Amino acid sequence: MSGAGATSRVRATAGVTTAWGRALHAELLKVVTLPAMWWSAAVAGAAAIATMMSVLQNVVDGQGFGFEEIAPTWTLAVQIGFVAAGVAAAGAEHSTAQGMTSLLVTPARGRLAAARLMVLTGTGLVAASVMVGASLAACPTMSAAALWAGGRTVVWLTAVLLLAAGLGAALRSVIGASTAAVVLVILTPQLAVFLGDAARWFPGQAGQIWLTAAESQADVTSAGLIVLVWTTAAQMAGIVRLVRADA
């Protein structure tokens, strides 16, 4: 009996492992084969290159600068691609038959949501790291401050991707999710003059405080937590919609 029980447990563990592997593989395959994701990556990459070229052309001969000095401006352009990628990743699930295919591959919706979150997080970290790393290397000056700024930028861009994807999954509308993400992430910093201190509670302005790190450590940490709360809330809303919806 004990031998049979051990065998059953091994088989159950193997089955769960296989199910997780299948779910992760399916989600990764969707991300890398979705044309909109590649277009979004191209937009982000082009924005990064254009921003760096503009900065380098305007630098006075012999004047050095590090990534920490251009990170906020650089990110304002690059994050547009990450917003588009997040909305596209979620939108493809509902604007096409991809959502039903996902459920056929991974019927357990909780596992599907977790696999999707892990794949998107990994994708965001890799894509952001590549772009930030290339821009860091292009800067004339390298320092610990530049590396810290690069790390904060990677975290922010990944959060933008997850926030947009969460909005897309929750709203199930490409137009609605795009509008909400653009307002929250891109327009809020531009409206900070009119919104005053209230702007700090929106992810876009909080992200700028997080990136510049020019304020007190408490304010920077608070900004990071605000971004985390917004991202978590958007993802949780998307997960709840996935688990409770009919398809």
Predicted regions and their residues:
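Secretory targeting signals
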Residues: 3, 10-17, 26, 35-89, ...
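Solvent-exposed, acidic/flexible segments
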Residues: 21, 92-93
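Cytosolic juxtamembrane amphipathic/interface segments immediately preceding
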Residues: 21-30
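Membrane-interface junctions
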Residues: 30-34, 96
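Interfacial "coupling" helices/loops that link adjacent transmembrane helices in transporter permeases
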Residues: 94-117
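C-terminal and late-domain segments of enzyme folds
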Residues: 204-206
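Short cytosolic juxtamembrane segments of multi-pass membrane proteins
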Residues: 243-247
